[in-house]
Amino acid sequence: MASASSGPAAAGFSPLDSGVPAGTAASGIKRGTVSEGPYASLMPVKKIGHRSVDSSGETTYKKTTSSALKGAIQLGITHTVGSLSTKPERDVLMQDFYVVESIFFPSEGSNLTPAHHYNDFRFKTYAPVAFRYFRELFGIRPDDYLYSLCSEPLIELSNSGASGSLFYVSSDDEFIIKTVQHKEAEFLQKLLPGYYMNLNQNPRTLLPKFYGLYCVQAGGKNIRIVVMNNLLPRSVKMHMKYDLKGSTYKRRASQKEREKTLPTFKDLDFLQDIPDGLFLDADMYSALCKTLQRDCLVLQSFKIMDYSLLMSIHNMDHAQREPMNSETQYSIDTRRPAPQKALYSTAMESIQGEARRGGTVETEDHMGGIPARNNKGERLLLYIGIIDILQSYRFVKKLEHSWKALVHDGDTVSVHRPGFYAERFQRFMCNTVFKKIPLKPSPTKKFRSGPSFSRRSGPSGNSCTPSQPTASGEHKAQVTTKAEVEPDIHLGRPDVLPQTPPLEEISEGSPVPGPSFSPAVGQPLQILNLSSTLEKLDVAESELTH
């Protein structure tokens, strides 16, 4: 007989650990051991965290095979979404954030659950009414949610995280399913009321979009999973990928990471590979920086740190020169009816806000990516999002006992640490990673500053951003880097960041300054004002986390 239950969780969110183990029936009789059926595995040959791969290539997570876990997830989501659809819609109440529903799935089936060929398991759903609201806010209908996640087998992603998490993607590329640790799931539960308030005020965000939180109890273990938006569509060939924090301490990809098909590079790699940054038009740059500023304020209010900006780059010019083959192109089954795409699910939609887009940008032509250019003028599409907002909670807890030992100077580690992290993150993204393409000069400015050069120039008299007249007499703004003006200047130093103004020079609520604060030609790059503090901060982080 299956058992189903629901109710508010007790203080401390104990239901994350409670419940009948998967190998135990409702009567308390042991049904099997973890060595039976799909929970059996060979000796692991590779193990990262709870994730291991045996000699046959089978992936297991907490002694449950990946195939069994995928099947349990699909059975559980099918049941919970179906049962929720029978309940009338209503406003979200405070107690809805703490409700946990549980259903037991015996392998022989029951009057509530179908028979299956996996071992017995229990499936828990956290805050089902609240997450239903989140899905509706992003335009995800229940039938589309089920169709995306449960109509076809989930696809396991081989490039897992450093924490050993498992990642699955839905067959239509719409959703990502990620395994999370107990503390991360617990923290997400505590975040839900504030997350609800933030989404009501601003659904357009680069923060993760959570669509569901579940737990599979199998083989006596709790496997917690979260369903999120997919930042990186498989249908688009990615040429580079970066995980950026705005820090330089130990922020270089390892040799092992570099050997992967699509390595995830870090801050020092970016400064060496793309020292001039990525250039966006003025409106796009302003929208992106305002979105980052707003999202960082939300994270700061929750005292969240250690998050990253995940950025994948599709080079449109390279893609045109590459041969079309199965290794570089993924195809989505066009015979299937396309489900309703989630609102604000792409990088472009996340930053556009309610403002008019302007005549030069059309999202359908850019596959959801943000158009940009590098210093060579190559056309790029950027796919970005803020990640790892749950992992930081563990680090914050480790630091809580050390607050009194931290320096209270305004520029160094202090009790206002989340604000420091947010400010550094914004500065790095909007001054170093992303740059604004200069606007075409107006006729008045041309008259004042001359026909060919902008007003600001280096010691040699050469402008950083010259505007050369064309044959028709019109001026076209061009992106000219210091490497082009003075080839001897080495911009690839990984330990140097462009000069930025002190914190106090930026008024509260104003957008982060653009790249106009870069040093003029002929002047050596200066170390960021906070670089020494940054090094102390990162050393402190390393010592506290080990």
Curated annotation (Swiss-Prot):
UniProt feature, compositional bias: Basic and acidic residues: 473-493
Substrates-to-products reaction catalysed: a 1,2-diacyl-sn-glycero-3-phospho-(1D-myo-inositol 4-phosphate) + ATP = a 1,2-diacyl-sn-glycero-3-phospho-(1D-myo-inositol-4,5-bisphosphate) + ADP + H(+); 1-octadecanoyl-2-(5Z,8Z,11Z,14Z)-eicosatetraenoyl-sn-glycero-3-phospho-1D-myo-inositol 4-phosphate + ATP = 1-octadecanoyl-2-(5Z,8Z,11Z,14Z)-eicosatetraenoyl-sn-glycero-3-phospho-1D-myo-inositol 4,5-bisphosphate + ADP + H(+); 1,2-dihexadecanoyl-sn-glycero-3-phospho-(1D-myo-inositol-4-phosphate) + ATP = 1,2-dihexadecanoyl-sn-glycero-3-phospho-(1D-myo-inositol-4,5-bisphosphate) + ADP + H(+); 1-octadecanoyl-2-(9Z)-octadecenoyl-sn-glycero-3-phospho-1D-myo-inositol 4-phosphate + ATP = 1-octadecanoyl-2-(9Z)-octadecenoyl-sn-glycero-3-phospho-1D-myo-inositol 4,5-bisphosphate + ADP + H(+)
Cross-link (Glycyl lysine isopeptide (Lys-Gly) (interchain with G-Cter in ubiquitin)): 87
Protein name stated in the entry: Phosphatidylinositol 4-phosphate 5-kinase type-1 alpha
Any one annotated GO CC term: cytosol
Organism name: Rattus norvegicus
Main location, first listed in the record: membrane
Keywords, ordered alphabetically: ATP-binding, Cell membrane, Cell projection, Cytoplasm, Isopeptide bond, Kinase, Lipid metabolism, Membrane, Nucleotide-binding, Nucleus, Transferase, Ubl conjugation
EC number(s) on file: 2.7.1.68
